[in-house]
Design a protein with these regions (language model features):
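Beta-strand-rich N-terminal accessory domains
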Residues: 112-203
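Bacterial N-terminal signal peptides
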Residues: 6-16
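Positively charged n-region of N-terminal signal peptides that target proteins for export
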Residues: 1-5
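Extended, loop-rich substrate-binding clefts of extracytoplasmic carbohydrate-active enzymes
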Residues: 184-269
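Accessory, usually C-terminal, subdomains that scaffold auxiliary metal cofactors
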Residues: 298-324
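Alpha-mannosidase-like glycoside hydrolase catalytic domains involved in N-glycan trimming
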Residues: 21-127, 134
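Primarily extracytoplasmic ectodomains and periplasmic/lumenal surface modules that are beta-strand-rich
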Residues: 32-37, 47-52, 68, 144-148, ...
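Acidic (Asp/Glu-rich), glycine- and aromatic
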Residues: 261, 273-307
Length: 324
């Protein structure tokens, strides 16, 4: 029998005795029986840092129960935050997605540190300020795109150049026929082209003075008081899975009181609907509540197109729909 030196024997045993790498296990419950595609899962980064001390956002691996590596994103909504104890205070959430099959009651995922730098995952959401088009702000995912209107569009044409002037705070819709990102492509080709379908979809939505798709206002029972164009913008996260941004609307007159608004948008990949939170401030400090209305344009045909839309209210949940 050949005897191994003690050092060699110790080296042979080390792989067996080495402690398992730290792992964060995430289990998500699904109470619905219906299939749910592209469900977004968020894990506070503080939980990641607690389970994986010293974890770096670009050195992670997220796997599902089948061992498939998933695309992920780490938000940083407080870019000036300090994290001297390295507990994850500087970051927001770890984000990834899962397609729940019909009847899938739960799903489990593992998050581990990785030696290699994580790949650059394809972006499926995008949001940006568009100064080259009168200060628009545009956003999209792989399903649909939107835009709204900024201060330069509302500015007067003092130079008499024929500049378009409009006060419009509704939300526009760009209908996409492709899953890749198109906002930059469409702005590059110009409005005379993106109002026609050239293969990728089109802007077929006429906002005008309406609320468009989800715009807001203050209702007094008879008339709707609406803001002007947004004044400032701030992007908090920008893909590849989730985009988050805010638009601020300065004070306007709403039935005898001054009101300001901040819109907070959350745009997720794979979703037909965005999440929009509006915060209204009564600048006069009156105690009586504001009645906020949310609008949806019934007849949205644009640029002489034939409008074909079907409006329906759903009393059970208070929602409204317009099918184009």
């Amino acid at each position: 029998m050949k005897l191994l030196p003690a050092a060699a024997l110790l080296a042979a045993l080390l792989p067996v005795l080495a402690p398992a790498a730290p792992t964060l296990t995430v289990t998500v419950a699904n109470p619905l029986a219906a299939p749910r595609a592209a469900e977004t899962i968020t894990v506070p980064w503080t939980a990641v840092a607690r389970a994986l001390p010293g974890a770096l956002l670009q050195h992670l691996e997220v796997r599902d129960a089948a061992g498939r590596v998933l695309a992920y994103q780490v938000t940083n909504v407080a870019p000036n935050a300090r994290d001297p104890q390295n507990v994850g205070a500087g970051y927001g959430d770890l984000i990834f997605q899962h397609d729940f099959a019909a009847g899938e009651a739960a799903a489990t995922f593992t998050v581990v540190r990785a030696e290699a730098v994580a790949p650059v995952f394809p972006a499926r959401v995008f949001a940006r300020f568009v100064p080259e088009r009168y200060d628009d702000f545009a956003w999209e995912n792989d399903k649909i795109a939107h835009r709204t209107y900024g201060p330069e569009l509302a500015a007067p044409d003092t130079a008499h150049t024929g500049k378009e002037v409009a006060t419009e705070s509704g939300l526009d819709v760009w209908s996409k026929k492709v899953s890749y990102l198109i906002v930059d492509r469409w702005y590059n080709k110009g409005g005379s082209h993106y109002h026609k379908d050239e293969g990728e979809g089109m802007d077929m939505f006429d906002v005008g003075k309406s609320r468009g798709c989800g715009g807001t206002g203050i209702w007094d029972g008879r008339t709707l008081a609406t803001s002007g164009n947004f004044a400032t913008w701030r992007v908090l996260a920008n893909g590849p899975i989730r985009a988050v941004f805010e638009l601020t609307y300065p004070a306007w007159e709403a039935h005898g009181r001054r009101v300001a608004e901040v819109k907070h948008f959350t745009v997720d990949a794979g979703h037909n609907l965005d999440e929009l939170e509006s915060t209204f401030t009564d600048l006069d400090g009156r105690p009586d509540p504001l009645t906020v209305a949310i609008g949806l344009t019934k007849d949205s045909a644009d640029h002489g197109q034939e409008g074909r839309s079907e409006y329906a209210a759903v009393p059970d949940d208070g929602s409204e729909t317009v099918w184009e």
